[in-house]
A protein has these predicted regions:
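Residues that flank catalytic or metal-binding motifs in active/ligand-binding sites
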Residues: 84, 121-122, 152
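Short Cys/His-centered divalent metal-binding micro-motifs
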Residues: 116-142
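Conserved aromatic-histidine-acidic binding/catalytic patches
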Residues: 2, 6, 80, 110-121, ...
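Nuclease and nuclease-like effector domains acting on nucleic acids or nucleotide cofactors
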Residues: 1-80, 137-139, 150-188, 192
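Glycine-rich, phosphate-binding/catalytic loops in enzymes
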Residues: 102, 142-144
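Histidine-centered nuclease catalytic patch
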Residues: 76-116
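Short, aromatic/basic amphipathic alpha-helical patches
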Residues: 145, 149
Length: 197
């Protein structure tokens, strides 16, 4: 089985699973969201990864910087990575939106896929940007919930995070490409052009 075929199987499994959750919600009036019931979907069923302007700049500025570099080595206080894979729409909000949007009618497979490609998006941000989201109380909430479908980046705009879509499905692929572009001493404009979708 190719990686593309395997990925498609994951999407189909996720669709079947969440149809069960919707059915249970309608019968029992209970939204199953806890107990790691969505973990598989949270970290496997998403679109192409994104990266913030600041994360790109920080990576390009330092030839020793890696995806796995620790905050404490770059001015931070924590022993976790400098680059945080952050959900543009907090996953608890994605869950709520899913139940609200499909409360009456199950999504067809393509509709389901479009929903998660749009709303379950990961963006690599610099740790200071992640800290700003926490300080503003935006760790797990979106203040413009009713207009979320039109502007998934509203939460980021409140703390000046600029997310750049990429052509990569995984963070490892993105950072490997960034490392090659850094070796070639590319400017940020060229880098953005090379990684974009």
């Amino acid at each position: 089985m190719t990686k593309a075929e395997q990925k498609e199987k994951l999407w189909k499994a996720a669709h079947s699973l969440l149809l069960c959750y919707l059915d249970f919600y309608r019968k029992e009036d209970y939204k199953l969201t806890g107990y790691q019931s969505w973990k598989f979907i949270q970290w496997n069923i998403y679109g192409k990864v994104m990266i913030s302007d600041q994360a790109i700049r920080r990576f390009l500025e330092n030839p020793n910087m890696k995806k796995s570099s620790k905050q404490k080595d770059y001015g931070g206080t924590k022993h976790i990575t400098c680059f945080t894979a952050e959900h543009i729409v907090p996953f608890t909000v994605v869950q709520q939106l899913f139940f609200d949007k499909f409360k009456q009618k199950d999504p067809k497979y393509d509709e389901f896929k479009q929903f998660f490609l749009k709303f379950n998006s990961l963006c690599y941000v610099w740790y200071e940007e992640d800290n700003k989201l926490n300080q503003k109380g935006l760790r797990s909430e979106v203040r413009n919930y009713p207009t979320l479908e039109k502007d998934i980046f509203h939460r980021y705009s409140l703390v000046d995070i600029k997310a750049n879509p990429t052509k990569f499905e995984k963070g490892n692929q993105l950072f490997k490409e960034l490392a090659l572009l850094r070796q070639e001493d590319r400017n940020i404009k060229d880098v953005l052009s090379s990684i974009k979708e």
